[in-house]
Amino acid sequence: MSLCLRLLCSVCGAAALRVPLGVSSLRALSGSAEGFRPARVAVVAKTTRYEFEQQRYRSSGLSEAELRDLLALKGSSYNGLLQRYNIHSENVEHIVQSLRKEGTDVRLVKRRDYDEETVRWADAIISAGGDGTMLLAASKVQDRFKPVIGVNTDPERSEGHLCLPVRYTWSFPEALQKLYRGEFRWQWRQRIRLYLEGTGINLTPVDLHEQQLSLEQHNKAHNSQLEQKSVAVSGPQLLPVRALNEVFIGESLSSRVNYKSCKPRFTFSLHRASYYEISVDDGPWEKQKSSGLNVCTGTGSKAWSYNINKMSSQSVEELLNIVRQHKSLNVSLDSDVIQRVTNAYNDSLVYNPEEPKMFFSVREPIANRVFSSSQQRGFTSKVCVRSRCWDACMVVDGGTSFEFNDGAIVSIVMDDQDALCTVLLDD
């Protein structure tokens, strides 16, 4: 109930929570009242599954016919992947040509070519893909006055929560005209920053989207930095990434057991709980074992965090039946009531992306006489975690990973200067 009330209060006060723009900020962005017409735009296009499969087997010298046969063996449709690629490519071209017709200087880049220099060059960034591409585009933007706009290039296959409404996929010039006329408002999506300290830490990030890397190669990417590790650092180090959706902390490869015999070595992967200590809002430290810890923003409250915490109508019905038995409540539990209660609870898990607060969730906590979980989820302004793990990672927006093993300490906070500038077009 308290969670519902907090969300109700936050919704009622949403307008007051918008980050204010000063005079210099308005001048830097040419505020929405004046319209926004960027001279240079970087369009970041996603890598489709078809392109990925081509890149993956290019080194093997496979022809298109051989690739088609290989995909069929894997249960994938070559024609289907090619069709989605063509749809995406046509919509990307629609975006690029619409911008160029307006005299905008456009730079079209893929994931591997998207870097800090491209971000500095551009007045605005457009992600052409889905939510994953939007997260990628946002990941390299540190300037809170550089807008990032998402366009869903394949609405049939991508939800696109972070993108413009679907109709602008095919009518992008209409979206541009609304920007030029100032028919929109800036939306400042709060992001999470991370301070890492402790012993044996590694500040080198690994890009998890480099899908050409095998699992073994991924480990080598981490281990190749061992020589650069410091046994301890003098103080907290601010990591060079910001989380738009969430930060997840947990064991990555569980436990691995190698067996040697006359046969080739093989590996078993068994589940290992994540062991850590946690402090919420500078409160007392608490030892926990769980399947990991998720800390999200208002933007991320609709994503993984929502699916971790949401309740099914079946669970709600069972709980209400127990309450009715113990409290002698004379309440009709028809399907409509159950569904309304379910929706009310699940809706309370989602909050405004502009609110400067986080929501943490402990996944499947273990509770016994040694380990406890006094609070499994809740809103917070600061979370500190001390790792007691052996093979753990701290993953930012599902795309960037940092080692987070025994002795490492992370402080998870928000800062207004990290807010990501996006737009909400007027209806």
UniProtKB/Swiss-Prot annotation:
GO terms for biological process: NAD metabolic process; NADP biosynthetic process. SUPFAM superfamilies: NAD kinase/diacylglycerol kinase-like. The keyword Coiled coil does not apply. Belongs to the NAD kinase family. Homodimer. Mitochondrial NAD(+) kinase that phosphorylates NAD(+) to yield NADP(+). Can use both ATP or inorganic polyphosphate as the phosphoryl donor. This is NAD kinase 2, mitochondrial. It comes from Xenopus tropicalis. The lineage of its organism: Eukaryota, Metazoa, Chordata, Craniata, Vertebrata.
